Amino acid sequence: MLHFKTWPALLTWLGLSVVVTSAGSSYSGSSSTYPKREIANISVIDTPLVRAAERFALQHSNNAVYKHLMRSWLYGVLMINANDTLSRNVDLEVHAISALLHDLGWDSTGNSPLISPDRRFEVDGAFAARSFILDHADGRGWEARRVQLVWDAIALHTERSIAYYKELEVQVVSRGISLDFSGPGFGVSEDDFATIGKSFPKNDLKNQVNESIILLCETKPQTTYDTWMQPWGDNYVKGYNPIGKRRIDLIFEHLS
């Protein structure tokens, strides 16, 4: 894994220098002009759209998932603050909304309008977040590029071998989420990591992840075959059978 301090050189080499504009936003100028509030002693962006996203996330999440969303957002904020390239270039509103809404595809309420019968949960979440933005008075003024960044950040947040080479916002969202499973890194100190954990304890994260992925393997197994989720189906779901549905099966079936 690349050390956090190597990001600027890597980004230059990849040609991923990002110029963040304020077009379509309710606020203009640098990120320092956004209104702020403190959560767990961390200063975060505080726009009406971010507040609405937090409420929307709470509405469509149980307590365990909501705490995971908040931790993921705050880890990302600390990563941004610790790196000059990120702090100069990351769109804080895009990052906040992406992090807060990244697990909408886990909404387990009955007949949720956010959940499709045939798409991966990451894609359901991406579409739900896009609809949320475009349904909000402030979000309707967003330029298409910002909306697409949110979609990409959510759709790719579990595919780190891709997300880590996308735009900065997409990278930070995925890396911030990953810290909830791997522990402090990417510029987030052990002390700051622990402070976030005290405000939003993750004692229930393991069970929640297992329950959410098992439910997907039971109710939408075709969206989990040949993905990182397949081991949950293989190990915990009776009758789960990916044979014949994996890419390797299709390749050998149709190619001579």
Identify the role of each PLM range.
Residues 1-26:
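Fungal secretory targeting signals
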Residues 24-35, 60-63, 70, 74-88, ...:
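Divalent metal-dependent phosphate-bond-processing catalytic cores, especially two-metal-ion Mg2+/Mn2+ enzymes
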Residues 34-54:
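Short alpha-helical hairpin
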Residues 50-68, 73, 77, 105-112:
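Active-site flanking loop/helix segments enriched in acidic
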Residues 72-74, 119-136:
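An active-site-proximal "capping" alpha-helix that borders the catalytic cofactor pocket
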Residues 87-92, 137-153:
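Acidic/histidine metal-binding catalytic segments
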Residues 91-111, 125, 129, 151-160:
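His-Asp-centered metal-binding catalytic motifs of divalent-metal-dependent phosphohydrolases/nucleases
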